[in-house]
Amino acid sequence: MITAIWAQDKNGLIGNNGDLPWHNPDDLKMFKELTLGKTIVMGYSTFASLGFKPLPNRHNVVLTSKTLDVETVSSPEEMCQKYDDFIVIGGAKTYLAFKDILERCIVTVIDGNYDGNVYVPDLVSGMLEASRTAYPATEKSAAREVIMYHKNYLPEAWSEITNPSQLITDLAGPDVYPEPDKVLNALNYTKPEDVKVVILGQDPYHTPGMAQGLSFSIPDGQKTPPSLRNILKELESDIGHRDSQDLTSWAKQGVLLLNTVLTVERGKANSHKNKGWEPFVDEVISYVDNLPQPIIFVLWGKHAQDKEALIKHKQVLKAAHPSPFSAHKGFFGTKPFSTINQMLTEAGSTPINWL
């Protein structure tokens, strides 16, 4: 998770010649609580304002080309290659350098008018406000408001459904798959008006480098999982051989490759069951079921077939799950791909190029 944290006044003022324009012990206490034990990155000027001394009990990194007694990185890209989870603490140029990859912003707005010459760039446009908490003035600190923003992951085309960006942010972590930007890939690649087929999976692959945000799909070059191997085997028997195990080309043609749970912890299958995904995915299924165009829902196995009650208006194609435990009990020989194309053609829709 890439987070930026700062305090500002109502006009966006954050600094005055290298110092804070205010003294607010309550906000400094919150900053300490949020950053202790974490990796923090700052610009050279911010580090200089600290007397070139790292903040204690935090892993300090400075964005600079200069040689220092602490770890340095030359670019945001280098920082992201080294760390998955860090907090950007300033200054203005450093915030701007990380703007396009920020996933969360924690902003304290200090009440009052202050003198200064450094303003925070606009970092939160396009983000969603997650929370806003007001704190009254105390004996030592002016009143302040703490606002939490998080990245908006939901594609504009799907804006009529509940936005799950907060859930993505809450569940994200270095050992959670897929990465936040990939969690909604099924929706990123397939707009509502383009949906022709829905293939329901269960949860993402829990092995590093495999989860793509598309049910059953993995990047080329990875070892083929058993269920995908059986899907490709049935495809070859039904229509022909497919070289790629990356199913993105299906998604781009209108095949919504949707899992019923969209994130997972490394090495722990089904670990994010009952974490909040089920209501969201049920809403997506119901929304797609009410789209005007012909759509075919493909339900392989009991887990997917448990969602059949949500499908009231579209055609449903059912079979056993392609897992090695059940593929010989009603998946192999069902010819789903040619059947789907025949159903699409009969409905006046363009068939899918499965190969």
Outline where the language-model segments fall:
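Short glycine-rich loop/turn motifs that provide flexible caps or phosphate-binding loops at active sites
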Residues: N11-I14, M42, I89-G90, D115, ...
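Enzymes that bind and transform nitrogen-containing heteroaromatic metabolites
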Residues: M1-N152
